[in-house]
C-alpha cells in the first residue's frame, strides 16, 4: 500500500519517518562524498526538468545503456530476493559512469527547485543546519504538494540511523535534492532506501539522457498522475483551438495539433508542472478534483503490460471499471470532422485528453503541449507515437466516432494485442513475450483479469460495481484490496482498505474538493478556491497559498511561513524559470519543434547544453566546463555507443527484441554477456571474468532459483498465487528463511536461519509503528499528522528521541534520548543557516546562488569553500588548513594538496591500474635519499577485485580469487602465503598464513571459523586455542568460552544487556544513564551539555584518583586531552574532519597523518622536531594488508598483515613468511590486556580505529571509541540514523564493524548476503572498499537521503559504467531483457555511497535478502530504526 500511496504523490510525504538533520561532525574525504542537505534546501524534479534529464546525462546514460532492464522490477515482480545481485543494471562502462555522475550530479544540483527539504535531523547538524536523512525526512515537493520522503542517501554516512541525504539524492516522488552544505561532504556513494517513483518510462530511463521534460506514466510517481494530469477538466473543449494551430505555424513542414482551450478550471499545458498542484490524498488544486490512481498489474519482459486505473471526480468517462474511471485498456480516439479538417481527441489511461487536428492530406500531427506525442493516420484508424516510451498505440477498431485501442507495440516488434469481440468488448490481451490475459465481464463492466498462458488460470485482479455502475471494490491480488464509496453526484467520498487506512473527501456545489482527511487525522486539509488563488489550511491550522496562470500551471506558492516560490512558463507550459523565496533562479530554454530542453542555467549562471538527433534523441551534452558527452544509436533506436569527454567509449549490443546482450569497450573487450529464454526472461549473466549467474522462473515469471557462479543455489518459494514477493528462501546449506507480508506488501515477520522471529506493526498509510526484535524488545514510532515525518521514537526502556517542526515542516529542535538538545534555523529557501548545540555554541552557514555552502562560521574557526562551474569542490580553507583538489575528466580526484602534503592518483583504465604517490614538502631537501615520495601501484581484475599491489620498496602482494570471486590466495615477497577456504554459503571457514617451502604452505597461523544458521560467528580456532560464543536470538554475545586441544572449556565472560541493547558484563559494575556510560567498575564518566565526555576519573582505594580531561570544538572534534601524569595532547583536523596531527609539548613528540580518503596512508613520528620514524599503510577496503616501517636513515621494513573478520590486525609476516608479530589478547570490546610497545604493532583496533595510548581511546574517524566501556564518548554525528543508541558500538564486535564511528554493521555477514544475491560476483577489491566504508554507515536524514537518492538516479548510468570498468564485468541483464537493478550494498539511508563499489546488480532492489528483515544488513543496520516504510518498500 505504501508504494501505491507513494505513487499517488499525495501521501508519500514523511511516511518513512525520521526527519532530523544530521550534525556535520567530520566529513568524508573531499569530493568522495556529497554535500549534505538540510531543511530549506531546494529539490528538483527530473519530470519537471525533463530536459534536465539530459543534464543528468550520467544517470541517464546508465539508464539508457540498461534500457531493457530498467523496467524489470515492475515486470518480473518481486523476485528480487534471488536475483538481487548482479543482473540489476547493466552499466555502460566507466565512461558512462563518469559521464553519468558528472552530468547528472551537476544537473541535479543545478536543476530548478520544486520546493524545499522540509525536515532534518533533530540533533545532527552540518553548517548549523539539520542534516536531512533518507527514509526519515521529507521534502515539501511543489510538484506533488505533499510531503515526500527522501529515498536516497549516502551509503557511508548515516544520521540517526538513516542515510544522510545529500545533493543528488532523490525523494520517493522522484525529486532530486539540489542544494546542500558548501563545506561538508557526506559519504561517497549513493544508496536507495525507499522506492522511488518512476519519473520516466522504461525507455526514458534507458535514455534519461534524452533530457526530456516529462515523466511518462510508468510504475511509480502517481502512476502517471502528476505526469499527464495537466488537463484536469472534462473532455468538452473547443475543437480546433487556434492556440495550437498558431503555434504550429512556427514549425515548418509539420502540421501541429490544435491544443484545446480548456474551461476555466481545466487544462494544464504540461503534466510535469501540473503535478505541483497535487495536495494531500491527492487533491488537484487547479481544479479541485480528487484523483485516485492505482496500477493493478505489471507484467511483460520487453514491452510493459500494465493495467493502470485512474479515477477523476470531475470526469464523465466510463471505462472498463465503471463511472469516472479511466484505465490503460480503455484508451480511445474520438474522431470528428469539420470541413476538410479532422479532429482527433486521444483519451489516455490517466484521464487526460490530447487534441490533434489533421488538415487535408496531413498524415502526422505533432502537439506542442504534449511534444512527446505524435499522431499518425493509419487508414480508418490512428497510431499514437510516444517518443519517450518509444511505443506505438494503435486505435483501429471502429465504433462510430470512436477508435478503440487495438495494439501496443515498439520498434522491436514486441507487441500487445487487444482482442475484442464483435461488440468491442475486450476479451483477451496477448503479449509477444508469451503472456495471455483473459478478461471476465459481469454485465457491462470488467469483473476479473486472469492469466491463462502456460496452462495456468491465475486470478490477478477482481472488481465489483454497484447498481449505478460505480466501482466499489478492487482487489489486486498481489497487493492491495480497496473499497470505494460515492455521493449522489457519483463523486468519490471515501476509500479504505478494510484495515487501518482510509481517506475521506467533501465537495462544494461546483464539485470541487473542499475538505479531506485520512486515518488517524493524517493529511487533513481544507481548501478555499478564491478568484486569484487557492488556500489550503491543514489540520494544524497552518495556511498555504497557491496561484495559477491561464494554463492552470502553478505560478507561485506560499508556504505557511510566508516563503514564496515563483514559476514562469512559455506559451505551451514549458518551465522557463523558477525563482526561490531567497531569489535563487534557474532557467531553461527549449527547442521550438520538439519541446526538448536545449539549455539549463543554474543559479550561478553556469549553463548546460543539450543536442538531439533527427529522431529527437539526446546525442550530446556539454557542461559548463566545456566537456562533451555523445551518444550514437543503431537503426532500431537503441543506444549503441557512448563517448565521454576523454574520448573513451562504451558499446552496447542488443537482440531483436531490444534487450541488451553485451557491453564492451572501444577495444572490443567484453564486459558482460546476457542470455534470455524464449519468453525474453534473463537466464544468465556472464561477467568479464567469465563468471556466470543463472536464473530459473515459474509460470508466472517469478524467479524460483538463482545460481551463483560457484554453483551455489538459492531457491525461492511463493505461498500465494500471483504474489510477487517470495516468502520462503531455501539456502545452499538447506537452511530456510521465512517472511510474512500483509496485503500492502508490508513485512510483518521474518524468521532467520536459526528460527528467530522478528515482528513489525504498521499503522495507517503503512507507517511503521512498532518493531520487535527476536529478544522481544520493542521500539515504537510516532509521526506528524501533516507531514508524516517521524517526530518521536520510544525505546524499549521508555526513553524517547523527539523532534519539533516549524510550520513549514522543518526540524527546529531535537532532543535525543539523553536529553541533549539541538536547535536549528533556516533561511527562506529552507537552507539551514544556524545550528546551536547543548552548550550554546552556534555555527552559521552561508550559501551561494546554487545553494552550495560558501562559509561556515563557528566560535573557534571559519571555513571557506570554493567550487568550479560544475559544482565540484576545489578548495577549502580555515585558520589552520588549506586544501585544494584537482579532477580528471571523469571527476576523479587526481591531486589533493593539504598543508604541505600532496597525494596524487594516476588512472590507467586500459591496464586497470591506479598509481598513488604520497609527497611531503621538505622531502626534496633530504640528502640521504630516504625521504623520496612513496609510490604504490594497484592492479585490479576486470571485475574490480584488487589483484596486486606493487610497493615503494619493490615488494609486491598478489591476491588470487576463486570461481565465485572471493579471495582464495594471497602471496607476497619471497615466501609469504595466505590461503582461504569458504563454505557453500560463501562464509570464510579457514585461513592459513605462513611461509611457502618447496611449494607447500607451512602455516604459522591457522584460524578456523564456525557459524550458526543465521551466519553469526560462533567459534574461532586459532592454532591450538579455541574460543566459542553463545549468542542470544539477535546475535549478541552472551557467553565467551575458551578451550582448545587438551584444554578444558571455560567460561571467560558473560554478558547481559539493557533494554536498549547496551552491554553489561556479569560480575562487573556497569552503569548506563539514558544510553551513556557513567560508570564502569572504578571509572566514572562526566559529560557536558552537548553530550561529550569531558572528564574520566579512575578511583581506586588507597590511590590518588587518576583524571583525564577532554575539550571539544564546536564541530564536536576532540581537541585537547589532559592526562593524569600532566601531559597535554593537542589534536588537529583538516576541513573534512580527518585528524591530521597530534602533539605533546611535554614529551616533545608529534605525529602527523596523510590520508587517502577515509584511510591513513602514511604516518610520521617526530621527536624534538626531528623525524624519527614513518609508516606506510596499504588497505584493501577497510582491511590493512601491508605495513611498511622506516626509521630515520634506515631501510624500509615490509610486513604483510592478516586480519580477523572485524578488521582487527591479527599478525604481521615478513616477506619470507616469518611471523613477526601477533596481536595481544583483548576483551570482546577491544580492550587489550597489555599496552602497545615500540614493536611493529600497527596500533589499530577494530576496523577504522587507531589506538591513542595517551587517552585510552581509539580514534574512529568521526568519533572516539572507549574500548574499556565498549562505547563512544560523544553523540553519534548522524543522530538516530546511527542506531538505537547514540553512544553504543556495534551489536556484536566479532561480526560487525563501525569504521567511521557512525554506525556498526556486520561486514562479514553483509558481504556474504550481498554476494549471495548479487547477479555478479563481488570481488575482493569491492568487498574491501565496502568494508572500508562500513564505518560511515549511518542513517541519513530524509533530506540527505533524498539528495543521495537523487544523485544516484541522476548518476546511475555513470556509476554502473564505473562499476563495469572497475570490475571488468558487464552489468547483468534480467530475463525480461532489462538490465539488472543497481542495488546499494550499504543503503543510502544507512549512509551508503553512490559509488561503483557500493552497488551490485540485482533483480529487484526492494525485495532482496541483502536488505531484507533478518538479513545481515537489516539485522545490523535496520533500515528504519526510527520508523518508516522502508521495510515495506524493500519487500521485507
Swiss-Prot record:
GO molecular function: nuclease activity; toxin activity
Localization per record: Membrane
YD repeat coordinates: 486-521, 569-605, 612-647, 766-799, 847-879
EC number: 3.1.-.-
Residues annotated as transmembrane: 48-68, 70-90
Keywords: Hydrolase, Membrane, Nuclease, Repeat, Toxin, Transmembrane, Transmembrane helix, Virulence
Phenotype of the disrupted gene, per the record: A double rhsB-rhsIB deletion is outcompeted by wild-type cells, restoration of rhsIB restores normal growth in competition experiments. Restoration of growth requires the RhsB-specific immunity protein, rhsIA does not restore growth.
Predominant location category: membrane
GO CC terms in record: membrane
Family: Belongs to the RHS/WapA nuclease family.
Function statement: Toxic component of a toxin-immunity protein module, which functions as a cellular contact-dependent growth inhibition (CDI) system. This protein may be a nuclease that is specifically inhibited by its cognate immunity protein RhsBI. Upon expression of the C-terminus (residues 1284-1436) in E.coli growth is inhibited, cells elongate, nucleoids condense and plasmid DNA is degraded; these effects are blocked specifically by cognate immunity protein RshIB. Cell contact is necessary for growth inhibition.
Protein name: Probable deoxyribonuclease RhsB
Organism of derivation: Dickeya dadantii (strain 3937)
Gene for this chain: rhsB
Amino acid at each position: 500500500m505504501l508504494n501505491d500511496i507513494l505513487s499517488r504523490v499525495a501521501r508519500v510525504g514523511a511516511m518513512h519517518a525520521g526527519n532530523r538533520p544530521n550534525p556535520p561532525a567530520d566529513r568524508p574525504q573531499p569530493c568522495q562524498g556529497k554535500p549534505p542537505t538540510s531543511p530549506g534546501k531546494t529539490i528538483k524534479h527530473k519530470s519537471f526538468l525533463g530536459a534536465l534529464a539530459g543534464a543528468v546525462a550520467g544517470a541517464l546514460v546508465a539508464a539508457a545503456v540498461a534500457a531493457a532492464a530498467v523496467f524489470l522490477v515492475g515486470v518480473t515482480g518481486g523476485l528480487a530476493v534471488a536475483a538481487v545481485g548482479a543482473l540489476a543494471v547493466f552499466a555502460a562502462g566507466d565512461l558512462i559512469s563518469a559521464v553519468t555522475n558528472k552530468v547528472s550530479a551537476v544537473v541535479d544540483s543545478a536543476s530548478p527547485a520544486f520546493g524545499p527539504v522540509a525536515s532534518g535531523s533533530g540533533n545532527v547538524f552540518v553548517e548549523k543546519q539539520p542534516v536531512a536523512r533518507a527514509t526519515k525526512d521529507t521534502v515539501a515537493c511543489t510538484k506533488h504538494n505533499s510531503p515526500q520522503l527522501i529515498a536516497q542517501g549516502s551509503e557511508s554516512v548515516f544520521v540517526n540511523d538513516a542515510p544522510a541525504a545529500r545533493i543528488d539524492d532523490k525523494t520517493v516522488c522522484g525529486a532530486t535534492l539540489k542544494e546542500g552544505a558548501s563545506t561538508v561532504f557526506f559519504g561517497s556513494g549513493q544508496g536507495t532506501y525507499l522506492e522511488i517513483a518512476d519519473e520516466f518510462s522504461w525507455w526514458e530511463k534507458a535514455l534519461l539522457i534524452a533530457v526530456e521534460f516529462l515523466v511518462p506514466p510508468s510504475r511509480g510517481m502517481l502512476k502517471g498522475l502528476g505526469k499527464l494530469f495537466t488537463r484536469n477538466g472534462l473532455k468538452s473543449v473547443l475543437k480546433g483551438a487556434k492556440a495550437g494551430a498558431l503555434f504550429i505555424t512556427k514549425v515548418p513542414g509539420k502540421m501541429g495539433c490544435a491544443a484545446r482551450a480548456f474551461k476555466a478550471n481545466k487544462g494544464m499545458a504540461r503534466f510535469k508542472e501540473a503535478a505541483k498542484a497535487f495536495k494531500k490524498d491527492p487533491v488537484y488544486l487547479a481544479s479541485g478534483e480528487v484523483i485516485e490512481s492505482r496500477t493493478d498489474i505489471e507484467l511483460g519482459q520487453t514491452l510493459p503490460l500494465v493495467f493502470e486505473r485512474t479515477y477523476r471526480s470531475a470526469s464523465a468517462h466510463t471505462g472498463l471499471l465503471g463511472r469516472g474511471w479511466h484505465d490503460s485498456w480503455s484508451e480511445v480516439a474520438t474522431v470528428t470532422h469539420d470541413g476538410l479538417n479532422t479532429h482527433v481527441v486521444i483519451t489516455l489511461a490517466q484521464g487526460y485528453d490530447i487534441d490533434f487536428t489533421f488538415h487535408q492530406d496531413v498524415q502526422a500531427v505533432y502537439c506542442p503541449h504534449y511534444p512527446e506525442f505524435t499522431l499518425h493516420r493509419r487508414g480508418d484508424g490512428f497510431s499514437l507515437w510516444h517518443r519517450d516510451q518509444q511505443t506505438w498505440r494503435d486505435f483501429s477498431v471502429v465504433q462510430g466516432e470512436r477508435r478503440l485501442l487495438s495494439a501496443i507495440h515498439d520498434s522491436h516488434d514486441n507487441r500487445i494485442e487487444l482482442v475484442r469481440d464483435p461488440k468491442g468488448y475486450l476479451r483477451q490481451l496477448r503479449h509477444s513475450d508469451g503472456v495471455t490475459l483473459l478478461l471476465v465481464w459481469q454485465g457491462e463492466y470488467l469483473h476479473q483479469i486472469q492469466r491463462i498462458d502456460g496452462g495456468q488460470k491465475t486470478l490477478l485482479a477482481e472488481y465489483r460495481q454497484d447498481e449505478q455502475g460505480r466501482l466499489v471494490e478492487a482487489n489486486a491480488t498481489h497487493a492491495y484490496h480497496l473499497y470505494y464509496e460515492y455521493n449522489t453526484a457519483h463523486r468519490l467520498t471515501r476509500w479504505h482498505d478494510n484495515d487501518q487506512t482510509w481517506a475521506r473527501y467533501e465537495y462544494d456545489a461546483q464539485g470541487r474538493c473542499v475538505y479531506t482527511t485520512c486515518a488517524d487525522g493524517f493529511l487533513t486539509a481544507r481548501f478555499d478556491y478564491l478568484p486569484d488563488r487557492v488556500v489550503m489550511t491543514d489540520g494544524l491550522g497552518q495556511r498555504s497559498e497557491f496561484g495559477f496562470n491561464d494554463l492552470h500551471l502553478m505560478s507561485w506558492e506560499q508556504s505557511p511561513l510566508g516563503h514564496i516560490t515563483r514559476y514562469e512558463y512559455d506559451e505551451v507550459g514549458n518551465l522557463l524559470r523558477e525563482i526561490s523565496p531567497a531569489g535563487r533562479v534557474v532557467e531553461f530554454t527549449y527547442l521550438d519543434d520538439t519541446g526538448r530542453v536545449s539549455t539549463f542555467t543554474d543559479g550561478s549562471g553556469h549553463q548546460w547544453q543539450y543536442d538531439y538527433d533527427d529522431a529527437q534523441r539526446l546525442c550530446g551534452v556539454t557542461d559548463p566546463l566545456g566537456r562533451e558527452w555523445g551518444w550514437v544509436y543503431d537503426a532500431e533506436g537503441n543506444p549503441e555507443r557512448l563517448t565521454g569527454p576523454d574520448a573513451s567509449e562504451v558499446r552496447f549490443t542488443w537482440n531483436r527484441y531490444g534487450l541488451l546482450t553485451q557491453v564492451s569497450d572501444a577495444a572490443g573487450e567484453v564486459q558482460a554477456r546476457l542470455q534470455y529464454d524464449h519468453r525474453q526472461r534473463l537466464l544468465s549473466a556472464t561477467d568479464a571474468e567469465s563468471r556466470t549467474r543463472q536464473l530459473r522462473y515459474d509460470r508466472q515469471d517469478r524467479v524460483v532459483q538463482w545460481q551463483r557462479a560457484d554453483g551455489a543455489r538459492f531457491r525461492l518459494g511463493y505461498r500465494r498465487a500471483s504474489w510477487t514477493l517470495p516468502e520462503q528462501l531455501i539456502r545452499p546449506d538447506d537452511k530456510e528463511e521465512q517472511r510474512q507480508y500483509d496485503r500492502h506488501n508490508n513485512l510483518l515477520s521474518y524468521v532467520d536461519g536459526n528460527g528467530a522471529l522478528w515482528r513489525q506493526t504498521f499503522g495507517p498509510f503503512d507507517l511503521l509503528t512498532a518493531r520487535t526484535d527476536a529478544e522481544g524488545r520493542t521500539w515504537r514510532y510516532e509521526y506528524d499528522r501533516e507531514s508524516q515525518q517521524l517526530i518521536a521514537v520510544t525505546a524499549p526502556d521508555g526513553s524517547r528521541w523527539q523532534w519539533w517542526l516549524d510550520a513549514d515542516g522543518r526540524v527546529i529542535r531535537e532532543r535525543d534520548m539523553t536529553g541533549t538538545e539541538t536547535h536549528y534555523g533556516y533561511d527562506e529557501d529552507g537552507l539551514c543557516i544556524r545550528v546551536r548545540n547543548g552548550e550554546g555554541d552556534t555555527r552559521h552557514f552561508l550559501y551561494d546562488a546554487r545553494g552550495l555552502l560558501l562559509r561556515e562560521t563557528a566560535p573557534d574557526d571559519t571555513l571557506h569553500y570554493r567550487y568550479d562551474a560544475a559544482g565540484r569542490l576545489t578548495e577549502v580553507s580555515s585558520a589552520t588548513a588549506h586544501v585544494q583538489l584537482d579532477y580528471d575528466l571523469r571527476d576523479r580526484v587526481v591531486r589533493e594538496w593539504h598543508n604541505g602534503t600532496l597525494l596524487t592518483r594516476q588512472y590507467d583504465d586500459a591496464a586497470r591500474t591506479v598509481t598513488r604517490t604520497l609527497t611531503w614538502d621538505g622531502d626534496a631537501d633530504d640528502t640521504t635519499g630516504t625521504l623520496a615520495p612513496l609510490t604504490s601501484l594497484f592492479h585490479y581484475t576486470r571485475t574490480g577485485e584488487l589483484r596486486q599491489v606493487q610497493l615503494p620498496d619493490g615488494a609486491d602482494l598478489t591476491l588470487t580469487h576463486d570461481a565465485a570471486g572471493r579471495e582464495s590466495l594471497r602471496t607476497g615477497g619471497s615466501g609469504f602465503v595466505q590461503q582461504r577456504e569458504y563454505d557453500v554459503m560463501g562464509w570464510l571457514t579457514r585461513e592459513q598464513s605462513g611461509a611457502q617451502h618447496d611449494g607447500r604452505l607451512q602455516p604459522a597461523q591457522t584460524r578456523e571459523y564456525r557459524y550458526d544458521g543465521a551466519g553469526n560467528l560462533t567459534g574461532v580456532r586459532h592454532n591450538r586455542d579455541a574460543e566459542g560464543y553463545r549468542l542470544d536470538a539477535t546475535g549478541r554475545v552472551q557467553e565467551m568460552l575458551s578451550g582448545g586441544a587438551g584444554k578444558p572449556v571455560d567460561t571467560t565472560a558473560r554478558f547481559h544487556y539493557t533494554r536498549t541493547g547496551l552491554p553489561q558484563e556479569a560480575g562487573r559494575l556497569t552503569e548506563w544513564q539514558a544510553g551513556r556510560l557513567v560508570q564502569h567498575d572504578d571509572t566514572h564518566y562526566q559529560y557536558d551539555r552537548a553530550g561529550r565526555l569531558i572528564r574520566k576519573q579512575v578511583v581506586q582505594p588507597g590511590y590518588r584518583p587518576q583524571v583525564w580531561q577532554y575539550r571539544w570544538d564546536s564541530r564536536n572534534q576532540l581537541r585537547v586531552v589532559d592526562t593524569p601524569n600532566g601531559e597535554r595532547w593537542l589534536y588537529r583536523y583538516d576541513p573534512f574532519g580527518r585528524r591530521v596531527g597530534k602533539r605533546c609539548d611535554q614529551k616533545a613528540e608529534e605525529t602527523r597523518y596523510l590520508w587517502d580518503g577515509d584511510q591513513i596512508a602514511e604516518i610520521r613520528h617526530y621527536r624534538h622536531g626531528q623525524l624519527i620514524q614513518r609508516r606506510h599503510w596499504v588497505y584493501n577496503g577497510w582491511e590493512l594488508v601491508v605495513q611498511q616501517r622506516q626509521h630515520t636513515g634506515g631501510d624500509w621494513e615490509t610486513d604483510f598483515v592478516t586480519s580477523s573478520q572485524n578488521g582487527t590486525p591479527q599478525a604481521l609476516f615478513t616477506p619470507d613468511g616469518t611471523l613477526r608479530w601477533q596481536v595481544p589478547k583483548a576483551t570482546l570490546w577491544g580492550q587489550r590486556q597489555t599496552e602497545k610497545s615500540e614493536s611493529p604493532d600497527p596500533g589499530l583496533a577494530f576496523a577504522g580505529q587507531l589506538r591513542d595510548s595517551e587517552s585510552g581511546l581509539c580514534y574512529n574517524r568521526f568519533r572516539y571509541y572507549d574500548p574499556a566501556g565498549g562505547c563512544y564518548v560523544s553523540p553519534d554525528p548522524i543522530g538516530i540514523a546511527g542506531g538505537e543508541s547514540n553512544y553504543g558500538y556495534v551489536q556484536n564486535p566479532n561480526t560487525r564493524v563501525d569504521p567511521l564511528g557512525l554506525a556498526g554493521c556486520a561486514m562479514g555477514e553483509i558481504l556474504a548476503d550481498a554476494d549471495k544475491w548479487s547477479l555478479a560476483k563481488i570481488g575482493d577489491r569491492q568487498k574491501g572498499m565496502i568494508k572500508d566504508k562500513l564505518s560511515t554507515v549511518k542513517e541519513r536524514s530524509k533530506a540527505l537521503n533524498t539528495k543521495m537518492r537523487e544523485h544516484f538516479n541522476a548518476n546511475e548510468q555513470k556509476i554502473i559504467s564505473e562499476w563495469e570498468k572497475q570490475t571488468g564485468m558487464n552489468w547483468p541483464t534480467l530475463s525480461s531483457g532489462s538490465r539488472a537493478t543497481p542495488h546499494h550494498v550499504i543503503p543510502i539511508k544507512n549512509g551508503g555511497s553512490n559509488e561503483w563499489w557500493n552497488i551490485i546488480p540485482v533483480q529487484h532492489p526492494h525485495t532482496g535478502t541483502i536488505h531484507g528483515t533478518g538479513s545481515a544488513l537489516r539485522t545490523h543496520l535496520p533500515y528504519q530504526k526510527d520508523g518508516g516504510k522502508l521495510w515495506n518498500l524493500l519487500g521485507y
